[in-house]
Design a protein with these regions (language model features):
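Long, non-globular segments of proteins
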Residues: 15, 21-210
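N-terminal amphipathic/basic-hydrophobic helices that include classical n-h-c signal peptides
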Residues: 1-22
């Protein structure tokens, strides 16, 4: 009975084809999907930080640097499924990412960050122009001191890797195309020789001019 109930809810939220896809991959979707969907009844993110379920081992899931999801090296092409999974990602103190539900957790292999910024827009918020970023799973993040931007420079290649905080300790890699657009809009700080953008009154550095 619980399996039928779970299937009906999954069918409504993520589609029968998505459900059958994971069923064919031998993942325990009944508990996984039902746990996620129950936690999302009020359109809120599940409280993954409160859950401490046992680890479900030997599940090969990966998020590539470009944000694409894989299961056993096969791409997960169902957008609704990926969006659903993205709501229960947790980054633990052991340095690993997990998909977490009340009944089980699955370790994720993440090549860089679990999210990727694909586009941005500028809007006036409280009388100030701010940058709004959109992730590959359609999260909207307003650049601010609460959701800051930072840039890491590779010591060998000197290539920048820009990130923005999405929620808690989960960051998104800003795609190269978006970063180049930000650089074009940035203003040079003559004192620090850094390129800066202003979002809602908060200033963020994109790096020094070489």
């Amino acid at each position: 009975q619980s399996k039928d109930y779970s299937f009906e809810k999954i069918q409504y939220k993520v589609g029968r084809r998505a459900y059958n896809y994971l069923m064919s991959k031998e993942i325990n979707t009944t508990s996984l999907f039902q746990s996620i969907l129950e936690a999302q009844k009020n359109n809120e993110l599940p409280p993954v930080e409160k859950w401490n379920p046992p680890l479900c081992e030997n599940v090969d899931m990966k998020i590539a640097r470009d944000g694409k999801w894989f299961f056993k090296n096969s791409p997960i092409g169902r957008e609704k499924m990926v969006k659903l999974f993205s709501t229960v990602i947790r980054f633990d103190d052991d340095g690993f990412y997990y998909l977490v539900t009340p009944v089980e957790k699955i370790q994720l292999k993440v090549e860089d960050k679990p999210f990727v910024i694909k586009t941005f827009n500028k809007e006036v918020i409280d009388g100030k122009e701010a940058y709004l970023f959109q992730t590959n799973v359609d999260d909207i993040v307003t650049l601010s001191n609460e959701n800051p931007l930072r840039v890491e420079i590779d010591k060998k290649t000197q290539e920048p890797s820009p990130y923005i905080l999405v929620r808690k300790n989960l960051e998104a890699l800003i795609s190269r195309n978006v970063f180049y657009q930000l650089v074009e809009e940035a203003k040079l700080n003559s004192k620090t020789q850094e390129l800066e953008i202003n979002s809602g009154g908060d200033v963020f550095s994109l790096g020094k001019v070489i």
